[in-house]
Amino acid sequence: MKDNCILTAESVTEGHPDKLCDTIADAVVDACLTQDAAARVACEVMATAGKIIAAGEITAAKIPDIPAIICRTVREAGYGGSDYEVEVITHEQSPDIAEAVCGGTETGAGDQGILYGFACDETKELLPLPVVLAHRLTRLLTDARRQGIIPGLRPDGKAQVSVEYRSGVPYRVAAVVVSCQHEEELPLPELRRDILCHVIRPAMQELPLDEHTEVLVNPSGRFVQGGFEADTGLTGRKLMVDTYGGLVPHGGGALSGKDGTKVDRSGAYMARYIAKNIVAAGLAKRCTISFAYAIGKAQPVAVTVDTEHTGIYSDDVLEQAVRTVFNLTPDGMIGTLGLDQPMFQKFCNYGHFTHADAPWERTDMTEVLECACRAKDMGVSHR
């Protein structure tokens, strides 16, 4: 990261069409795991005006009522749940993949993949400030709609925050963009005033707006038609919203719609868990963890740690400690983080790494990591 720069992150509300598809897919995963903790799920959702399609591979003791799940989830997001034709196209996991994943003594990775996790000491969430602020904006936008604080708001919306850094530290908010769906009768000047008062200013606790901050509310003007009526939604299209706002590398795999044997999900969560514990322990100010997996193989083929020269130990020592302390197989990650339990819909919105009660957000391994680093460092020093 450059010492002097502007970094930007975005977030979307739970009524955004792509994010609602993610939420539906995770609701399906949760329903499968509720009935069968060993369920194998890879669910994709596409939705457009008047139609929602759920498709993928599901191997479970019992297939849940997916149309009912879809209608309920759409209603919970603030739309009419019975206004769509629903089509479900599923089949069981490929026997070749099933054998590769489950045929050995250990569960193998459900696919190849490159996963990244990140943490920094910039905020109490141990995330970059633009990411935290963007998600806070969309949470407050949804709260303002649900609680009637701003009458006339509708479910679809998004936000973007640009933060200016000086000497590597957040200095000021350079720009805020909020776009929110609204009822036709709501005057735009009134909407802009209310969003500034009830959403934007309360969200900017760490860095209040200054006289030079550019604030844009519905910069395109009218935003009456939203959701699936305005844009086709698809799972896996909000990867940066789900993770680190584009400020950290991403391997390209989506999180939602997948059970824990898919390392796109379990590996990304585990990488965040490890990076957060490293930073929480004071072992580094910034930390990126990366894993690479091969389909059918339990152990990662690569593990790397990059602290951007902010660590109190070398990255090599930290990598050895990570390999020693954590079980990085799919079984190990599922067991450590409880990923065979139905929980994913709860953490699907407003970033997967902003929820303090998510298992991968725990900082319960700091002391173990510190001890492992000391031991590894002594071993390296005495070679």
Describe each PLM feature range:
Residues T8, A68, R75, G81-Q225, ...:
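Glycine-rich, mobile lid/loop segments that gate access to catalytic sites or pores
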Residues A39-C43, G157-V163, T213-V217, L283-A294:
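A short glycine-rich, hydrophobically flanked beta-strand micro-motif that places a catalytic Asp/Glu
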Residues A42-A60, I295-Q299:
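Short, charge-patterned binding micro-sites
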Residues T48, R286, A292-R383:
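Internal helix-turn-beta structural module
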Residues E10-V12, H16-C21, T107-T123, V224-V248, ...:
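Conserved phosphate/anionic-ligand binding catalytic regions in large, soluble enzymes, centered on
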Residues E14-L33, T123-R139, D259-G282:
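Alpha-helical support elements that line or immediately flank enzyme active sites
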Residues M1-A42, V368, A372:
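N-terminal, positively charged regions that mediate nucleic acid binding
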Residues L186-A280:
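Glycine-rich anion/phosphate-binding loop at the beta-strand->alpha-helix junction
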